[in-house]
Amino acid sequence: MTNEGTRIPGYVSLDKVGNGAPYVLRAGEGEHIAVRSSLRTLLTRQEDTEGHMGLTYCEGDTAPPTPPHYHHDTTEGVYVLSGVLRVWQDDRKGNRIVSDLHPGDFGLLPTGWAHSWAFAAPKTRFIAFYAPGGFEGTLHYLDPHGAPTAEQLGETEKRFDVVWMPDYPLIQESEKTG
């Protein structure tokens, strides 16, 4: 099953403008994909950057966290534009961090660290990058209406650098450090 994207004003298929050629997306343009109660917009993909990176714009209201996961080779970064983004990180060796990121804050989610994030306030917007690119492709495989199914998570594990940990305990509010 693939999430083919929500055709809303500003939808631009990156297959028509990207693939290694330079391009410009105007405000509100990109490949829009509905995921639960949020909208993700692909701005650039692995195939547009010779594999070097992917970049998405994300916006949504308060929502449950993404399934915890980690990457063998991919580093993620998030830059908050508005609202609050709650980020959980765990190096799986005893170092656990949870941070509320506010406008202007940046968070790095390193390779190998288990992590998750959630829209923690209404009208939260942020930019996410992935290096090397590829993980952004998971958005096409997630259910636009609810939490991802085990089948959807398994399919993305086969195609992308991600190991999902749906039963991994997130840090409780009382453990918050940043």
Spans of model-derived segments:
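Short acidic-glycine-tyrosine-enriched beta hairpin
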Residues: 26, 48, 91-111
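Short, charged/polar surface micro-motifs in flexible loops or helix N-caps
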Residues: 48-51, 60-64, 84-86, 93, ...
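Long, hydrophobic/aromatic N-terminal blocks
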Residues: 1-45
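A short glycine-rich, His/Asp/Glu-containing loop-to-beta-strand
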Residues: 27-68, 74
